[in-house]
């Protein structure tokens, strides 16, 4: 009997002991910066000449690590190992699989600040963002372990007096996990452990800019007792290894988190039945958003401004849930805008390894160039009242940017930016605000700041997003509390951290015995 699930608490860094412990975590990570990490296939550590080089986005000269890069030949070897291992792993007891997750969670909990420090160095996350990422990784393992225990005996169905009917879940097969760089620990660990605890074997291809934290997680899984071959670590390029594995006839499902364009490409490729393939592949996809905070005229305006700033600029706006549009009732528009500008100008953009830094860098040069191109668009489509500047001389730093008076059909209101840029748009009334918020191909998160109960209930029904929040920001979903996933081009509405997520990695089997 396991204790009831409760999410991992965030660390209070105002407590001196916690601050010192995190600093020790940073020192430990700094002691092994620049190391080489192998591929892992069937428990065999394989070193290749071709490497993925991971650098600190806050300091391009600092090498975080070098990870061996898989070729198609090695990807094929990994597929064969995973396929063979599945024949035994699928018959393993769910209790044993859940126990591995619980042990892995305990190991990460003991090394919490070390893993967070890796995220500071490799992903450019400030302390609080890194700590939340690690806590979420722990949450996924604790939650999915418990969910598997709930599903292990199936779901009751009806039986007539002459029969005994059972409805049970069995694993799918080999899953390809393609994880993102923005939550390189939490989402990577969640996608991987959901697949393995459901009885599947895994080919893990982490994001190319953040592979070291995934390599360190492989160490955790091994220490937790995961048998060799269940999770195979195959970092590589999307065009070479990613496409090969997505197309492979032995791939049973693909779990992907990333951009809309790549997600669509995977979805299209997975739909094709290739020679030797005897099933229709399943795709579990989360693909981003164009998320809006709507501010009603009857609202706590200070809460509104703080929610917009926190949701827009947390982790430099590099969250699929980030607020990139603030749609505000015209009667309170100027007040909320001016207060948001004041709060934004108080933010510090600096080295995320320093406690108190609000914003670190963006992910890499490509991200920097893309975001700055949208800043340039913002100068044409509105008025820049805060930020608007970037500096990529040492790291990829961009100032938090507010663009005011943006038209509802402007590019800044339509296209995902994935950086610290938020567009402010004026609405005539609440219905108009909801119409603007829904005027996008995405549907991931949104928030409404309002004291009007009728408007809240209208939004609950008509604001078309997978995660809708009232009187708070639009980021920060907690595993098991706010299952996360969106509509439309935000993905397949696969609710990570929710009660139906594991079922996506399994197939239902009905057995009926005549008595």
From Swiss-Prot:
GO biological process assignments: glutamate biosynthetic process; proline catabolic process to glutamate
Pathway assignment: Amino-acid degradation; L-proline degradation into L-glutamate; L-glutamate from L-proline: step 2/2
Short name of one Pfam family: Aldedh
InterPro entries, per the entry: Ald_DH/histidinol_DH, Ald_DH_C, Ald_DH_CS_CYS, Ald_DH_CS_GLU, Ald_DH_N, Aldehyde_DH_dom, Proline_metab_enzyme, RocA
GO molecular function: 1-pyrroline-5-carboxylate dehydrogenase activity
Domain of life the protein comes from: Bacteria
Enzyme Commission number: 1.2.1.88
NCBIfam families for the chain: D1pyr5carbox2, PRK03137.1
Annotated family: Belongs to the aldehyde dehydrogenase family. RocA subfamily.
Protein name: 1-pyrroline-5-carboxylate dehydrogenase
Biological source species: Bacillus cereus (strain ATCC 10987 / NRS 248)
């Amino acid at each position: 009997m396991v204790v009831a699930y409760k999410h991992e608490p965030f660390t209070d860094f105002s407590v001196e002991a916690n601050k010192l412990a995190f600093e020790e975590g940073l020192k430990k990570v700094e002691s092994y910066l620049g190391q080489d990490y192998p591929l892992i296939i069937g428990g065999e550590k394989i070193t290749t000449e071709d490497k993925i080089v991971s650098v600190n986005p806050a300091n391009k000269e600092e090498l975080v690590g070098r990870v061996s890069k898989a070729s198609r030949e090695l990807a094929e070897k990994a597929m064969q190992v995973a396929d063979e291992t599945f024949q035994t792993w699928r018959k393993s007891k769910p209790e044993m699989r859940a126990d591995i997750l619980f042990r892995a969670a305990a190991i990460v909990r003991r090394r919490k600040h070390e893993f967070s420090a890796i995220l500071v160095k490799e992903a450019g996350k400030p302390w609080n963002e890194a700590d939340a990422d690690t806590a979420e990784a722990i949450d996924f393992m604790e939650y999915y372990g418990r969910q598997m225990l709930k599903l292990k005996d199936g779901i009751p169905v009806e039986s007539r007096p002459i029969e005994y009917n059972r409805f049970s879940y069995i694993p799918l097969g080999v899953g390809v996990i393609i994880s993102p760089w923005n939550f390189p620990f939490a989402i990577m660990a969640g996608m991987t452990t959901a697949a393995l605890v459901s009885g599947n074997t895994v080919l893990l291809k982490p994001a190319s800019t953040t592979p070291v934290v995934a390599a360190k997680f492989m160490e955790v899984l091994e220490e937790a007792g995961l048998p060799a071959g269940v999770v195979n670590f195959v970092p590589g390029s999307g065009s070479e290894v990613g496409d090969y594995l997505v197309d492979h006839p032995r791939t049973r499902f693909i779990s992907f988190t990333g951009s809309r364009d790549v997600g669509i490409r995977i979805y299209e490729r997975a739909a094709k039945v290739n020679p030797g393939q005897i099933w229709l592949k399943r795709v579990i996809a989360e693909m981003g958003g164009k998320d809006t905070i709507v501010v009603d005229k009857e609202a706590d305006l200070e809460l509104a401004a703080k929610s917009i700033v926190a949701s827009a600029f947390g982790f430099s706006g590099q969250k699929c849930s980030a607020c990139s549009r603030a749609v505000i009732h015209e009667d309170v528009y100027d007040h909320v805008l001016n207060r948001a500008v004041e709060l934004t100008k108080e933010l510090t953009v600096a080295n995320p390894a320093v406690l108190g830094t609000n914003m670190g860098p963006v992910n890499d040069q490509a991200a920097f160039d893309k975001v700055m191109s949208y800043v340039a668009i913002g100068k044409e489509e509105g008025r820049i009242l805060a930020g608007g500047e970037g500096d990529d001389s040492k790291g990829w730093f961009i100032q938090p940017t507010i663009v005011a008076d943006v038209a509802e059909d402007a590019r800044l209101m339509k296209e995902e930016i994935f950086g610290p840029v938020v567009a402010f748009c004026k609405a005539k009334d609440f219905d108009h605000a909801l119409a603007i918020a829904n005027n996008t191909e995405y549907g991931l998160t949104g928030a409404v700041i309002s004291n009007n109960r009728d408007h809240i209930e209208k939004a609950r029904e008509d604001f078309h997003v997978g995660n809708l929040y009232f009187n708070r920001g639009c980021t920060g979903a907690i595993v098991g509390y706010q299952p996360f996933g969106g509509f439309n081009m935000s993905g397949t509405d696969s609710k990570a951290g929710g009660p139906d997520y594991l079922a996506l990695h399994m197939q239902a089997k009905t057995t009926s015995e005549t008595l």
